[in-house]
């Protein structure tokens, strides 16, 4: 049986017609120049007047039906109105037009059969063309005709023109591609939108002390701590060491909050009266709107807050009791940090929260989402036929874009162009493709199903040449429990335009993150917790937009869960380390071959070079840097000409064991049977045992260095101290060049002068003691 050919996971360069012309890598300057032009027939139905009544009451319930071939679009209808206003736009794709005439019919809504009021017919050959930046076409009044072409009472105001996707009416228009979608919510879910991430702040709560607490049991020393609640986040201080009614903590707690501030900060002072029982001694609520905002580490004024206590009275009523207890705190919003909501490796924005600290932008990123090909069926329609309703989401900085959804197509064409301001070239733009599962009543029939992932592409801006248009077809890869799968390809056009080359070069000398991350850094555990909270806030806020950018989409774009354990990813990282060290290992092997005179000519040349450098040591550093310069110039001919893309071999996705993939997709905590968990635990113990051995060996070598002067082995330390004294005397009376010359000739000596036994220094080092004898 013949094996199927391997899937093509490579990146392909393309030559599309962008902006009406072929791209050759030169700079283009026209609007929508990174996408292919798509022709549409636009019909703007503005209003009607003096419509005749069709009912017994002499009134009408009018609506307009726009018909082009087999496509029909209808406006909303009005009840009992003879002068209705619609102001709706219909867009028909010119590629699918199979008619010669456009018909706009005004009808009267009825229970049995809608009555014809009148119509207007247009010959497609007579319709004008309009392309921005031309002004919008002015609508005109058209007299209605009956089915025989006779003029009837009533007029309809219309504007009809041929245009492209660059038209201002395009985003909000009804599209013939989505003629099968009905319902206001479903139509809103298929339109292109731009979203903005909420402005995130770090909230620092410095709990200093409390005074005059009133515990219920005055015969014991209270164990007091403070619980701080901010939305869904809750942190607590340690139990105060001063077990009294005036406890002290001086402890910092960090939270993530988003503008607009909707919830107050809740502080609760509690006494641990039993192992699983805490008693509330007082509470206070602090509105965030009135807190200080600081942009550096200048001290914030501390404040005393009164504590209140709610007591449940007879009848279940809550009574608020005010007493003299107070809590002393410093609370501020930190504007000098960048709130991390993305994976640190794929950050698209590194600016601080405070806009006052932002530097000017250094360029513009332009992205053209052209089309996708070969998409896989993501769901089944009625009758069992597979279908895909694909849309794209791109994120860079605080701006998210969502393209329109192309209904029932495995080769969707979007041809939408977007721009972002760039403040740092060492950032990443992420483009994801998803299947829209909220159409055709998807929210009801599918139980609110999630939008399925089709794939994702990341492009690092620093890998792009300035002012060059990159047009490539990227593979869309998704890792399943059964292995990596190609879901199709997405065709993108990308251009990074630099406004100031000098400013961009200067950025490479600046720290990646704002100053506060280095002057007063947060701990790793704090950053992990704050990143998790930030992603939750962003996904919640974007889910509340209209139409929503759903939680599963946001989390996939932000790489939530990428820090979880994965055997496949661990192997990939190990081989990445080996790839980095391979150059050093290759140099070591090359030097070893020189030392054993494997190639006598090369060894002689190295001897000559060594002697020159010993005689003229001032040439060492210039020689090294000149060598690196020549290597860089030599490699320029073979520099990468394409952006990097997902590499299945580097990720070990093409060779991962099914059980390893099943473990990677396991929930946390695990949901697998106990025997499988036991097997994986034993495997992890085996791997950890080998790592433990390697770490122990490294610790042993370090401890041997420490024992040289520790007198743990008195004879070894005595020998080393005596050797140091002799070496100091010899090096003092001998010129350095002579010493270096002697050491070099000894290292490069001929194999006939070598012994296969280990050297004396190595034998001495291996005999030194380590602390392994003290290990249990």
Swiss-Prot record:
Location in or out of the cell: Endoplasmic reticulum membrane; Cytoplasm; Vesicle; Cell membrane
Binding site for Ca(2+) 1: 55, 61, 108, 110
Phenotype reported upon loss of the gene: No visible phenotypes. Plants lacking both FTIP3 and FTIP4 have a dwarf and bushy phenotype due to an accelerated stem cell differentiation causing early termination of shoot apices associated with an increased STM localization to the plasma membrane, but compromises nuclear localization.
Residues annotated as binding Ca(2+) 2: 55, 108, 110, 115
Tissue: Highly expressed in both vegetative and inflorescence shoot apical meristems (SAMs). Accumulates in root meristems. Observed in flowers.
Name the record gives this protein: FT-interacting protein 4
Gene: FTIP4
Assembly behavior: Interacts with and regulates subcellular localization and trafficking of STM.
One GO cellular component, as annotated: Golgi apparatus
Family to which the UniProt record says this protein belongs: Belongs to the MCTP family.
Presence of keyword Methyltransferase: no
Top-level lineage group: Eukaryota
Region named Disordered: 1-23
Topology with respect to the bilayer: Multi-pass membrane protein
Membrane spanning residue stretches: 577-597, 608-628, 719-739
GO molecular function: glycosyltransferase activity; metal ion binding
Residues annotated as domain C2: 22-142, 181-305, 346-474
UniProt function note: Required for proliferation and differentiation of shoot stem cells in the shoot apical meristem (SAM), thus determining the appropriate balance between the maintenance of shoot stem cells and their differentiation into other aboveground plant parts via the control of subcellular localization and intercellular trafficking of STM in the shoot apex. Prevents intracellular trafficking of STM to the plasma membrane in cells in the peripheral shoot meristem region thus facilitating STM recycling to the nucleus to maintain stem cells.
Cofactor names: Ca(2+)
CDD domains documented for this protein: C2B_MCTP_PRT_plant (cd08378), C2C_MCTP_PRT_plant (cd04019), C2D_MCTP_PRT_plant (cd08379)
Annotated keywords: Calcium, Cell membrane, Cytoplasm, Endoplasmic reticulum, Endosome, Glycosyltransferase, Golgi apparatus, Membrane, Metal-binding, Repeat, Transferase, Transmembrane, Transmembrane helix
Composition skew (Basic and acidic residues), residue ranges: 1-16
GO biological process, one term: shoot apical meristem development
Major subcellular location class: endoplasmic reticulum
